[in-house]
Design a protein with these regions (language model features):
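Conserved helicase motor core of P-loop NTPases
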Residues: 1-144, 149-204
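C-terminal accessory regions
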Residues: 163-306
Length: 306
């Protein structure tokens, strides 16, 4: 019952979208999208009921399937270690609802590639930016939500005695190689020194010392971190968000706008949440929308753990 916007009513040159772009006609995923759209509209569980009864509809790599946890894990490892993925990073991606699940999947995949005891970063690591970092001339070094491959890496101790890695990243969007910047080795004891300096500079700024915030951000933006951490300030606990992370898995929210050939979905993480009272279902409206976004990222196929 909305009124038609004049923008669409009187404009001469306009485009009407009538064709499916991501998935080819006949892809079984299209039927799932239809079920989910109805579920979103009516707050129902038709999609979940359907896939429980029809656990697989895939042929020639097109469609969907639900597989057990052990098989799901091995499938992820196989896909990310395949020649196909190395030639095309949009071949495969994992998505989940919570940051914890994303972190867990990233660890499983990366450990299978470089081993559990490897440094926090490694040549050819796939990383995803969680922040836009600019240089002193306000030119972006890395862009939020962009994929990068670790092109070059050199161990480096900063003037403050912080163990870091001096790295160059290659953008998977345009092939641009970034200027060198520093990633803090969060496994090293000197990470505590980094946090101490950051806390000190934050407190100076909070106390309104002249140019305090400028100094704080100048220091902070010299270093990138790959995990979220807290510092204890005069204003209480402050959480510092990570700048980058491994890019094999990402939250459903982070995938919006992206398309991958094949997507692995931790459906259990979307449908349920763990509480102190046990496992409970997430809000039906939220989970239906999340499931729709997650499934619709795939061009060819989806595998689900549920």
């Amino acid at each position: 019952n909305e009124e038609i916007s004049l923008t669409f009513a009187i404009v001469k040159n306009k485009v009407v979208l009538t064709d499916i772009v991501r998935q080819e006609e006949g892809n079984p995923l299209l039927e799932l999208f239809s079920l989910l759209r109805d579920d979103i509209k009516n707050q129902t569980n038709t999609f979940l009921n359907y896939i429980v009864r029809n656990r697989s509809n895939i042929q020639d790599g097109i469609g969907y399937e639900i597989i057990p946890r052990a098989m799901f894990n091995q499938r992820l490892i196989d896909e990310f270690n395949s020649d196909t993925f190395h030639k095309n990073i949009d071949h495969f991606r994992i998505t989940a609802y919570t940051n914890k699940a994303v972190s867990d999947w990233n660890s499983i995949v990366r450990n299978s590639i470089v081993g559990k005891d490897a440094d926090i970063i490694h040549i050819n690591d796939l990383v995803l930016s969680y922040n836009t970092i600019v240089d002193e001339f306000k030119e972006p070094i890395i862009l939020n939500s962009e994929d990068y491959i670790l092109e070059d890496i050199r161990p480096y101790i900063s003037d403050e005695g912080i163990k870091t890695f001096a790295v160059n990243l290659k953008s998977m969007y345009d092939g641009h190689i970034t200027q060198p910047f520093l990633i803090v080795d969060t496994k090293d004891a000197s990470f505590l020194k980094y946090k101490e300096i950051l806390t000190h500079l934050y407190n100076r700024a909070a106390n309104r010392v002249q140019h305090g915030w400028y100094v704080y951000y100048k220091f902070k933006n010299r270093f990138l971190t790959n995990l979220k951490f807290s510092i204890e300030t005069i204003q209480g606990t402050k959480w510092i968000n990570k700048d980058i992370d491994y890019g094999y898995s990402m939250t459903v929210h982070k995938t919006q706008g992206s398309t991958f050939d094949n997507v692995a979905i931790d459906l259990t993480d979307i449908v349920f949440q763990n509480t102190r009272f046990g496992r409970r279902e997430n809000d039906i409206d939220i989970r239906n929308k999340l499931m729709y976004v997650a499934l619709s990222r795939a061009r060819k196929s989806v595998i689900m753990k549920y």
